[in-house]
Design a protein with these regions (language model features):
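Short hydrophobic/aromatic helix or loop-helix immediately within or flanking a transmembrane segment
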Residues: 73-82, 92-117, 144, 261-265, ...
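Signature aromatic-anchored transmembrane alpha helix within multi-pass, membrane-resident enzymes
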Residues: 48-52, 214, 219, 275, ...
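Start-transfer (signal-anchor) and selected internal transmembrane alpha helices
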Residues: 1-57, 209-216
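Membrane-embedded, lumen/periplasm-facing catalytic core of multi-pass transferases
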Residues: 333-450, 480, 492
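Membrane-interface alpha helices of multi-pass inner-membrane proteins
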Residues: 56-60, 131-137, 151-182, 192, ...
Length: 497
């Protein structure tokens, strides 16, 4: 009996430690469905309901634009897939993008079409405590889907010292993320290698998980792209070749190597930054692999000249783990710190979601009105703004004649190449006079940023254009982007529009 009692006494601390581990994982990953958490019964369903309600509100309160890809690489492509009109950018002509992601939205469009419910309001795909997550997560960017799949994958990732992970599930989610956006592989390289290193049955991991998952997802992606491209295209390889190996993304701008460390990561973390640093110092060693994944990802992206905030968005969930661990360690200051984070993120979230850069979307409602009368067949729109500044047919949903300034990169290596948008902005007045040498070529409506108005005012007056709408865009105009967007229409057409 004494021996049995001794064994029982030694087993209790182990069970207590196991319970603590389960609770930590529950806090870290949210314990979906309450299946894997260590909290009270009903806690996870309530948390899930709260999260769904929050994202529903998030969706309603994001009414601004972020970057062109949220429309041009998803909704515009899907619109063309279903309704047979829409614009495909140069990436699609060169096989750098795959149809797997737009197919999600195309399926929704097709259902609406079959139900005869494809009016423009329904075709505005709903863009469902971190301000950057609030700003980005509900957008139709591939980066947002990449981040979402990363979060789900992390919930199944096998942490050292725990047997609660699922190799097949997390590897499947990673594979799906890579199909949608090939750069999703970057943050997972150290995590997968860490898993492989600690895995005792390495051969089983490769033969029973890695190879089957890779073959199924890659095969499905190939078939989907074969159907829509009409030929075999390995878009993931083309994407990596263009953006990583050839580094041709510099055509769209470049930043210094340290930009992600000095601006990118601090901006997307915001007021979470000090908590992130504190959490990195306090977190146990077994969680350092997540910090390594963050550092590795930022370093890799730092080697590429073209940089954007959204590129490192997928590491934000990893950073938030350390922020949460920091709050846990603060104990007496926990509630005050949480209140500070909530209040300090509320203002930038609401401002960027409701006000900043909303003109790009609002102006399309003016364009869409041209579809609602008999004037449609005579109407035409020319968007004289930096290329892809607004959505296109996905937000108009009628075959209206529309045109915009284009800026595809030159893939032939011609160093003297200048795209149409740069040619226009080098001398807008001369470009317009040369392009529209005959009045019959003039569009019925012109759309441009307010900063351009004075420079082309003589052309507008000479050709008989009059301002018909002024749309607010941003409080911080920069370069070619103005504070407002103007809509001009020809005076002779005013009785029809």
């Amino acid at each position: 009996m004494e021996a049995a009692g001794g064994l029982l006494a030694r087993a209790r601390p182990r069970r207590a430690e196991a319970v603590r581990l389960r609770k930590r994982r529950s806090v870290l990953y949210g314990a979906p469905g309450g299946r894997r958490g260590g909290g009270a019964p009903g806690e996870s369903p309530r948390l899930l309901a709260l999260a769904v309600a929050l994202r529903g509100l998030n969706c309603a309160l994001v009414q601004t634009s972020f970057v062109p890809d949220e429309y041009w690489q998803s909704l515009e492509v899907a619109h063309r897939m279903v309704f047979s009109y829409g614009y495909l950018t140069w990436e699609w002509e060169n096989g750098l993008r795959g149809y797997s992601y737009p197919l999600i939205f195309a399926s929704i469009y097709k259902v609406l079409q079959l139900l005869a419910k494809d009016d423009v309001q329904l075709l505005y795909f709903c863009q469902l405590c971190s301000w950057f997550t609030w700003y980005s997560c509900t957008r139709t960017l591939t980066n947002s889907m990449e981040t979402l799949l990363t979060i789900f994958a992390l919930s199944y990732y096998p942490i050292k010292g725990s047997k609660m992970g699922s190799s097949c599930k997390y590897l499947t989610l990673i594979a799906l993320a890579i199909v949608i956006r090939p750069t999703a592989v970057i943050p997972w390289i150290p995590l997968v290698f860490n898993h492989f290193w600690q895995e005792q049955k390495k051969a089983d991991l490769i033969l029973h998980n890695c190879i089957p998952v890779g073959l199924v997802t890659a095969g499905t992606s190939l078939i989907i792209d074969r159907v829509f491209f009409g030929k075999w295209v390995l878009v993931q390889l083309n994407f990596l070749k263009f953006n990583v190996l050839q580094n041709l993304g510099t055509f769209y701008g470049s930043h210094p190597w340290h930009w992600y460390f000095t601006q990118g990561l601090p901006v997307i973390l915001g007021t979470h930054l000090p908590f992130f640093i504190h959490g990195c110092v306090q977190a146990p060693k077994r969680y350092h692999i997540f910090l390594m994944a963050v550092i590795w990802t930022v370093l890799v992206y730092s080697m590429l000249s073209h940089k954007e905030f959204r590129f490192i968005y997928p590491v934000l969930p990893l950073c938030m783990f350390f922020c949460g661990y920091s709050l846990k360690q603060l104990k007496a200051w926990k509630k005050s710190a949480a209140s500070f984070l909530l209040l300090s993120n509320l203002l930038p979230a609401l401002y960027t979601g409701l006000i900043h850069q909303r003109g790009s979307l609002d102006v399309m409602s003016h364009v869409q009105q041209l579809c609602n009368n008999s004037y449609q067949s005579q109407a035409s729109v020319f968007i004289m703004m930096p290329c892809h500044s607004t959505p296109f047919y996905s937000h108009v949903h009628c075959p209206l004649k529309m045109r915009f300034l284009q800026c595809p990169p030159d893939l032939t290596g011609n160093k003297s190449y200048i795209d149409e948008a740069d040619l226009f902005y080098s001398n807008p007045l001369a470009w317009l006079n040369e392009e529209f040498y005959n009045d019959t070529l003039l569009p019925s409506h012109l759309i441009f940023f307010s900063v351009l108005e004075q420079e082309i005012s003589s052309f507008l007056a000479l050709k008989g254009y009059e301002k018909s709408a002024t749309v607010f865009h941003t409080h911080v105009p920069q370069g070619r982007v103005g504070s407002h967007i103007y809509v001009y229409r020809k005076k002779a057409e005013m009785n029809h529009a």
